[in-house]
Amino acid sequence: MEGPQIDRIKLGREGEEAAVRFLKKKRFKIVERGFRMLRGEIDIIAYDRKTLVFVEVKTRSRAGFGVPEESVTFSKQDQLRKIAQGYLVKNRLGDIPCRFDVVSVSIHDDGRPTIRHIENAF
């Protein structure tokens, strides 16, 4: 991997780190990051009080590509639901309140992030 691919990976990591800091400030308890199954990955799994929250982080460095959350398509939402279901089964969590949030991170030229948290995004 080199060039733009590495830049995208670095940008994604920066966005996830910014999202974790943001959620911790809001008193979320982070329980897992990068939960993977065959179908894909959930970026962050956390508790917001007694609700288990599956968080998709989307990061952009330029506004020309649109706002980050626009890339959470219906098919991506379906994929995240299936992965979340697998997480619940694997961890024997049964019938607990859950929701799906999106954290949108826009990285400015000076490296400063702007974060938008969309609770119950889908």
Task: Tell what function each PLM region has.
Residues 1-4, 60-65, 119:
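Short glycine/proline- and charge-enriched loop/turn segments
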Residues 1-33:
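Acidic-basic catalytic patches of nuclease active cores, encompassing PD-(D/E)XK
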Residues 23, 42-64, 80:
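Conserved catalytic cores of phosphodiester-cleaving nucleases, focusing on short active-site segments
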Residues 28-29, 52, 97:
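Hydrophobic "anchor" residues on beta-strands that sit immediately upstream
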Residues 61-81, 87-90:
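Mg2+/Mn2+-dependent nuclease catalytic core
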Residues 90-122:
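Domain-level recognition of nuclease-like catalytic cores that cleave nucleotide substrates
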